[in-house]
């Protein structure tokens, strides 16, 4: 994959932003991982996309009116029978596929959904994106919607243990509010707390 350390269209327009852990990072660029593109398209870890051949930044627009922050962009590709296809591609997915490398555990747990950590789908910076699966996304939605009593967290952990999750897997997805996070998970694993909830799950 070809990469650039500066904006390939206008090197002066290479941005600096807060990356992981709040540290300043310079924008990086790479050719989009889409086969059979007609022109050369480049995506940045800041969430910008450019057509290098025609020297312009691609417009990002909402996929649906009811979800104005979920942004897509249009990229031209060529089909097997040599026809032009103008397809819509989610900006977050392009950034994640390029700059958020999946770990072995991501693959093992079938994490194929790109989730914006701050729930702002228009924030396409790579450091705001994580790979999740449907079960994890459902749990994260429940937490966002206020289901945050201790017994709720017990249910979340029980469900993930039932699916074969390791302690580190659980901590990576759920920001458990208690200080003794590992002890909390292990107590649930041993069914020594909230036994009436734990009894509903097989692990």
Language model features with spans:
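Conserved recognition-core residues within compact binding domains
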Residues: 2-113, 120-169, 174-179, 183, ...
């Amino acid at each position: 994959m070809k990469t650039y350390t500066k904006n390939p269209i206008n090197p002066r327009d290479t941005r600096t932003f807060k990356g992981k852990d709040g540290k300043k990072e310079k924008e990086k660029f790479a050719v989009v991982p889409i086969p059979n593109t007609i022109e050369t398209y480049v995506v940045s870890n800041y969430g910008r996309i450019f057509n290098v051949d025609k020297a312009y930044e691609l417009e990002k627009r909402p996929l649906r009116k009811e979800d104005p922050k979920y942004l897509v962009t249009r990229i031209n590709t060529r089909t097997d029978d040599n026809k032009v296809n103008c397809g819509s591609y989610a900006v977050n997915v392009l950034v994640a596929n390029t700059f958020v490398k999946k770990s072995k555990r991501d693959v093992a747990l079938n994490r194929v959904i790109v989730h914006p950590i701050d729930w702002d789908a228009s924030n396409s910076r790579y450091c705001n994106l994580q790979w999740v699966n449907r079960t994890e996304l459902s749990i994260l939605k429940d937490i966002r919607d206020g289901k945050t009593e201790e017994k709720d967290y017990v249910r979340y952990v029980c469900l993930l243990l039932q699916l074969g999750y390791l302690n580190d897997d659980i901590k990576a997805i759920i920001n458990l509010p208690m200080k003794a996070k590992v002890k909390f998970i292990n107590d649930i694993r041993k069914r020594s707390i909230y036994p009436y909830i734990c009894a509903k799950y097989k692990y």
